[in-house]
């Protein structure tokens, strides 16, 4: 028996709020990547990939957006990279070019993408300490 389970009620979902400087542009950006959007009002939507989701809101604070990072652990970061690279996100949305996957010292291979509001996304895959995929 898990003693923590007895003390803390279980949760059904964990969905962070992400800022959108221009809500419609951000919504199109995430849809282009492959997120499904479920509107929750004029300037809020739940965006999901499978069972994982976040809430996009039409609210923006530069300091928050520029310091926000989101981590997505995937099975095959190279496959994700080919998908992301094929979308030409820089020309479509005026963002900095996404960074191709690279091995990081903390044991992950990570591709980096910055959304139109400045939120940094890490698409990552676990690697062995020798830098090779398991």
PLM region spans:
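Core segments of cupin and vicinal oxygen chelate
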Residues: 10, 17-54
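Short, positively charged
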Residues: 23-26, 88-95, 134
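Short beta->alpha transition motifs characteristic of CBS
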Residues: 58, 104-105, 112, 123-130
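Vicinal oxygen chelate
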Residues: 70-120
């Amino acid at each position: 028996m898990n003693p923590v389970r007895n003390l803390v009620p279980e949760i059904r979902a964990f969905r962070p709020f992400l800022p959108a400087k221009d809500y419609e542009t951000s919504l199109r950006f995430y849809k282009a990547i492959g997120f499904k959007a479920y509107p929750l009002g004029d300037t809020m939507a739940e965006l999901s990939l499978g069972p994982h989701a976040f809430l996009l809101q039409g609210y923006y604070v530069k300091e928050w957006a520029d310091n926000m990072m989101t981590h997505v652990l995937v099975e095959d970061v190279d496959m994700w990279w080919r998908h992301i690279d094929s979308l030409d996100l820089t020309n479509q949305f005026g963002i900095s070019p996404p960074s191709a996957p690279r091995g990081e010292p903390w044991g992950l291979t990570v591709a980096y993408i910055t959304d139109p509001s400045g939120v940094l996304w890490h698409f990552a895959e676990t690697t062995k300490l020798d830098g090779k995929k398991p």
